[in-house]
Amino acid sequence: MLPIVPVGRLILSAAGQRAPYSSVHVVQQVTKAMGYTTVERGTLNTTSYCLYFKYGDSFISPFHDIPMLADEANRTYNMVVEIPRWTNAKMEMSTKEPLNPIRQDIKEGNLRYVKNCFPYHGYIWNYGAIPQTWEDPGFIDTNTNCKGDNDPIDICEIGYRVAKRGDVIRVKILGIMALVDEGETDWKLLAIDVNDPLAKDLNDVQDIEKHMPGMIEATFEWFRIYKIPDGKPGNRFAFNGEAKNREFAERIIAETHNHWKALMQRTDTSPINSSTTTLEGNPHLMSQQEAESVVTSAPVPGPGAGQDAAIDKWYYVTVK
């Protein structure tokens, strides 16, 4: 099956032709089977680091230009991997800047890392987001009675392979959990890479417990306690922490996709940067020349800085 190309003005050079934007100093890695590449700028483990996305020779926004659906007929979705399994750096699409590169979250001037709450180390799944979705902070969800968290909808990919930051993978949705994080609705999708050996056996949320016993319980516990070492209370959930089924999850995805579509038509002042390079007729359309300028203005790549050994520290926590 051929990869689905983002809709709109996407100019790809013919095979063998030199890419027209070769002036950009890049470190590229090809994401599996989909034609997406990533472009590193700045220095890893510093505030300057950022990861831009391309499709073919064209810069794109992973938030707005990668289609939500990978294959509508087979109900599979695209996932942008922000944080590979077992890692601690809190990476996420930067929703407030042009092209929405992946950056490490910063809190009080410091790079943010999740703590290792025993027995978990870092993130226990490949973690990321579904593109072309948005949890609207102006929308009060009737399931949680809380507003959205102003981000694309989060997703935990539970397969065996440790993905790479910036991978774009096709996933099958299995279920969803409704985390309430500091008073905001923060949906957590459960999914599996369609190429995972278990994918054929996992079709809904009940199949996770059957074939991966303990995964849902561990996911609930991880989200409940992961902020406690930072001095915050345990997180709470709607539905008493129950993971809802695939049908429910896909309704939530559709709802957040509609919120994203409305966002992309807004022309008022918004903290979200809606720049797109592929969606013709959109008020936020950006030319490739403008996109290249954004990337070249970012710091040039440098050798990665080391991480503090304290990142590997265990934390033993209880929920009060």
PLM segments and residue spans:
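Hydrophobic N-terminal alpha-helices or hydrophobic patches in metabolic proteins across all domains
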Residues: 2-320
